[in-house]
Amino acid sequence: MEVTSTTFISTTRSSKYLTLTSYSPVILPASTLRRDFLGCCHSLRPSPHLRTRAGKRNSRRSSIRSPRLVVRASIDSGLILIVVAVTAFSAIAFAYCQSTFRKRKSSDEVATVHGGKNSAENRREIHGDIHEGNPVEINVGFRKVEEESVNLLEEEKAHQIHEVAVMDYDSVSAEDSQFAVASVTTVATAHTLIDESFSSSIVNGSVALESATFGVKTPEKQVGNSEDQKGLEHDFSQAVVGIHSIASPQVVDDTRALEYEYNGLLQKPLEYSIFAESKREEIHTFYGSNHSSAKSSRLPSLKAVSPAVTSATNSLFLDHKNNGVIDTQFPGQSSGQATGDVQEENLVAHSNGGVSHIRKDVKGDWKFPSDGKHVGHQIDESMPQFPARNFELHNSNGRSPETSDAYNRLLRDGRIKDCISLLEDLDQRDLLDMDKIYHASFFKACKKQRAVKEAFRFTKLILNPTMSTFNMLMSVCASSQDIEGARGVLRLVQESGMTADCKLYTTLISSCAKSGKVDAMFEVFHQMSNSGVEANLHTFGALIDGCARAGQVAKAFGAYGILRSKNVKPDRVVFNALISACGQSGAVDRAFDVLAEMKAETHPIDPDHISIGALMKACCNAGQVERAKEVYQMIHKYGIRGTPEVYTIAVNSCSKSGDWDFACSIYKDMKEKDVTPDEVFFSALIDVAGHAKMLDEAFGILQDAKSQGIRLGTISYSSLMGACCNAKDWKKALELYEKIKSIKLRPTISTMNALITALCEGNQLPKAMEYLDEIKTLGLKPNTITYSMLMLASERKDDFEVSFKLLSQAKGDGVSPNLIMCRCITSLCKRRFEKACAGGEPVVSFKSGRPQIENKWTSMALMVYRETISGGTVPTTEVVSQVLGCLQLPHDAALRDRLISTLGINISSQKQHNIFPLVDGFGEYDPRAFSLLEEATSLGVLPSVSFNKIPLFFDTTELPKNVAEVYLLTIFKGLKHRLAAGAKIPHINLIISIQEKEIRTPEGEKTIDLTGRVGQEIGALLRRLDIPYHRKDSRLRINGVSLKNWFQPKLDSPFSGGKPGDLRSSQVPLGNQISRQQRSIRLGNLSLE
């Protein structure tokens, strides 16, 4: 059965108003007619509080019925002439728009879909002509009029049209709703009934009403991520709405989900309805295509309702935020297309009735995939078809709404560089309006990503930046700890002619504080004072916080004194910063003084959880664990609920001591105060259990955290692996590692280090080496801790090959030898060197004319030691002693004879020991040992001895064996040079360690003093050198005269025929000459005669 569509226009007269009613088609009875707003597929219903459930059900049922259109308008009879004028003006405007499109060489294409094929016979062009037939076309759009004369004319007519175009609905029509419509054209057929009174205003069966446009300007658009937004501000200053309606006997549900992509961002269209608030009831104003008449006073606001799915009405809406297009499709006809800022649009018919959209934009490519299924309406081929048109839509500044939407999407995704590139591109084309960009959102994104350069580029795009803009830019620099950037902001402020305010200086001070630049911080403060800007409480808080971060408690209290001198009342934040400064420097008593000062204020300030946490940290840094427990009790005293952070600090305070009971009480307090623990707290609790050797409790804590729904990650499992390491249970550690792999959790290097440490402690070095290779397969990089633990295990097993292999791998991975690695290598080298000496291997060479150690183990020890200290590591006395042990000469008769022959002197066999003062190193150590000891003294490893004190004191109680011996020989070497210069030799007092021990004798138990190991070695050294000494209690005394005689041994004179002589008699002329030279220097006689 074929159904034709008929449009009726009827008029009724009242005493004052004419009522015009138009509807099409007449398929349904009048009682079922729905109140539809012109240009919108949603029904206009009363306010939600006036609707009943029955009404809602009726509206849902009515949404699936056949299409019809009802237009009712109440027009004052006195304004009929104005309607005629409006009609004429609309025709002129329409003709002008058509001529504009022709000048732009825009081609009109006719795309008619008939079951998936194009019909060339049905293509017709519409250029202002009125077509016969049943279709009703309603085109609603805003067009831009460029000529100034037309704009002025349209502005004159805007207010008149505003009063004329009023539609009168029934009393149940929706209250407080206004809509923007550009042009209304009703095309009627020959069956249309027209009132005679309106025949003069209708040309060829058409009635046109136009009014002024309106727009809502939103200079700053808030970027949000919520999917349930109920109110959004939109820019509708220019929009195009194309509505085509063709009667059809069928109603087919057609909700097509279009997806398009811009720069890789997937977007989906939304269906929505638009409502605006109004104080007038049952009056809806229609506006025409006049763009120059900007805003109507009767439309105070425009709001968009949240998206809703309306598949029953078979309408398709493109999201205005994405395309700037509202495309409404009535049942029975494919939707007309209207685009914003689009250069080309092609409609391609498919066999299934679908339409493939391909659009090319100015800025980017918007792609509409053709995989979305679209069920087209079956259209009678006899019906005339209207061609789809291409429109270019721009905002008032020539920028497409799609550009702003693209910027907002990029900003939401955190693509700051793409955002700034887009804005700079618009600026080059003179299309950028920074007033419509929300500045705070961009600076906030830069602050999160520490994008200082992008923030400066954004600021340069702002034509007239304010002090608020510079403050936001300074905040970005402060969060990024970029001092140079912060100073650059200050220069920009000065160059712009503005005076920096207190907030800007405070942010700059905070930036210096976060970077640890205390001097720069105070420099800015003095600059601020010299500029006449008064510092406030936040400024002093930033100063004190910077001093606290650097641990400079004196400067922190200095800033506090300035605060007091300026009569600025400190708050809790300032006091907390002072307590933190005291904690960093270990001044616990000073921190408690600050707490007492808080309570002594005129209005006492009670500590909060930050104060308690800072005090507990101060106690922990000073090693006062018991005092930290007392501070924790203040939480109950002051009724502080606290946060997980302060409870974590309390648990960490008892970690080293392994006080499991106190940690459990803290956990209990958290539960009582309903404080939800986080993963960091559970990790600290597991660490305490590990130090307490309670491994089962540690695993129980992990299960407890899971039962509470805490999402556990690498922090918790690393702490649990550390607990296994502390408990020295390598089997549990392996089980835990397998569990970590089973849950597909990627372990960190700290987790693997704890596993390797547990294996090394369990004497499982081969397995530990296997997991070293597995670290690299996991994509992790071994660090210093990894190689240190492995080297310690190899050193305990005396496996030099493994240690040397690890050292080579460490160098390959870019890990420099640290103190532990150096100590392990030097210890292994010393053992092998001593073994070589004991086995009689030749280790001494006389190639240089003096005795020198030449051995591979000594060379290896010296090499690792040099690499360690060259990296900035300060060695310990133990490491220095091990290296010196590799430079000690062996004590055998063969070496002594070789030394005598090298000297080339004759000595009696009874006085062989007197030759040692004449040998470099005194025959005990390689001469390089003295240089190494002097270097260690310069690094602060060993104390220095002053020769100006008489007698000399040398304490050996805290020194290792080799260090004590070389140190004493170094003193002898210095005294020998002083003796050659004519100085007197002082007495030497050596302090050695003494141990008391009880022994049993026939007379009973007695307590005797035993010399320590170092004292015994020094005594043996003096006896080998034949230096007389006297022991009294813990002191060894060497007489200066005896030492002088030892420096001048008696040798056989080469002129006495082998008789022993005195070395002093043969050296008298040389000694007299040296004395004369010294006397001449003292008298100032420097002549060369």
UniProtKB/Swiss-Prot annotation:
Transit sequence range: 1-72
Outcome of gene disruption: No visible phenotype. RuBisCO content only slightly reduced.
Keyword terms, alphabetized: Chloroplast, Plastid, Repeat, Transit peptide
Pfam annotation, one family: PPR_long
UniProt superkingdom: Eukaryota
Organism: Arabidopsis thaliana (Mouse-ear cress)
Gene3D superfamilies, per database record: Tetratricopeptide repeat domain
Tissue spec. comment: Expressed in stems, leaves and sepals.
Name listed for the protein in its UniProt record: Pentatricopeptide repeat-containing protein MRL1, chloroplastic
Subcellular location: Plastid, Chloroplast
GO terms under cellular component: chloroplast
Function: Regulator of the large subunit (LS) of RuBisCO. Involved either in the processing or in the stabilization of the processed transcript, probably by acting as a barrier to the 5'>3' degradation.
InterPro entries per the UniProt record, alphabetical: Chloroplast_PPR, Pentatricopeptide_rpt, PROP1-like_PPR_dom, TPR-like_helical_dom_sf
Positions of PPR repeats: 466-500, 501-535, 536-570, 571-605, 608-642, 643-677, 678-712, 713-747, 748-782, 783-817
PANTHER family: PENTATRICOPEPTIDE REPEAT-CONTAINING PROTEIN MRL1, CHLOROPLASTIC
Gene assigned in the entry: MRL1
Principal location class: plastid
Family: Belongs to the PPR family. P subfamily.
One GO term (biological process): mRNA stabilization
